Amino acid sequence: MGERLLVSHFYAHPVGHAVEALHYAHGHWGSDTSREVSVLLNARTPVELAGLCPWVTRAYAVDHPLLERCADSPARLAHVPREWDWVLDDGRRYQDWQLELFPGLREFSAASDEWFACRIGRSVSGQHRAGYAQAPWRFQIPRQAADAATDTLNGTGPRIALMPAGSSGPEHYPSTASWHLVLDGLLEAFGPDLQVVLIGKSSDEDGRTATAGAGRYMTLRDHPVTPMSAYDRPLVEQLALVEACDAFLSPHTGFGLAALACGTPWLTLSGGRWWEYFFNGVPFRSILPDGAHASGSFAALEPEPLAADGDAERSVSMTQARIRADVPRIVRAAQELVNGTLSYERAIAEYYAELRTRVEPAAIWSIDNVHVAYL
């Protein structure tokens, strides 16, 4: 039996952070496939995604607060085996500002330092000290779910999965009226055979993230495209539908990382706090905001400026004026991705050439530092 590694990624619970951990697990397994690689995740994140990754031996869910302090951190780790050859931490736990922002992360980290015993060593996930082979990977969607998705999307036209919002406040995402403009453009470009499926989750009562403003976005089903709704279906079923589509369309959201793990090209209405930083060897397009519409974007945790947008205030990069101006760019990008005319290398080179005009190059970061080769 080879070495036993634990990728310890206790962090915020949006789905994208689980995908990050599984990506690192794949890289550490890929450097020596005789290894047994397990992952530790926040219990509120979709831990079941590890079951779609045959290189993951086991996933450990840890029920521990992130935003608040915790009086019994050691007890919450007791079900995780203590002894490993390697424990590989999420690098965020070594960032002082993260520990200030998330007191629970500080206490989890201290408890894990006390609990884990490493035969060889401890490092940061993605670092080569413990062996790491960066390579694209894909979720292994169960055949039954994949076949059901194919049966559901049984038309002959282009297929686009649409997630209209992520899990932050509704002011960070386009309005229903803006999405109607996008669907108008897509319908004109692709014709009546276009199939659109709505992806999302309407409630966070189970402790997991939900799609902001989910109820309002259900009115998109009244658009002439007649999107079908996959809202609130089990996560694996929704991922199977995404995998069966030609493109995944959304604002910046961690679910986009899951789409890339399905091998589905991601078309992002970029803007807001974060740029796109994970790519997984899949063609993509990020429609970066231009000019005044970019005001306040990509400032991480700094407050975003809001602008009047109909009957609400919205991030400047997500207003109807911005979306209307960018519909032609969105449609062209959708055509590239649906038609398969865009290579990954061209996509990433053009993305970073444009991003560096919006963000100081020294401030840009990405998973596995893939940006370095393009700046």
Identify the function of each model-found stretch.
Residues 260-292:
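Gly/Pro- and small hydrophobic-enriched strand-loop and loop-to-helix capping segments
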Residues 1-55:
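N-terminal pre-catalytic "stem/leader" segment of glycosyltransferase-like enzymes
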Residues 54-141, 147, 156-165, 169, ...:
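Conserved nucleotide-diphosphate donor binding/catalytic pocket of glycan-assembly enzymes
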Residues 114-152, 282-375:
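Leloir-type glycosyltransferase catalytic cores
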Residues 6-9, 89-104, 148-214, 272-274, ...:
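Active-site donor-nucleotide binding/catalytic segment of nucleotide-sugar enzymes
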Residues 176-272:
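Donor-binding and catalytic core of enzymes assembling or modifying cell-surface/extracellular glycoconjugates
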Residues 48-67, 214-228:
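Structural recognition of alpha->loop->beta junctions
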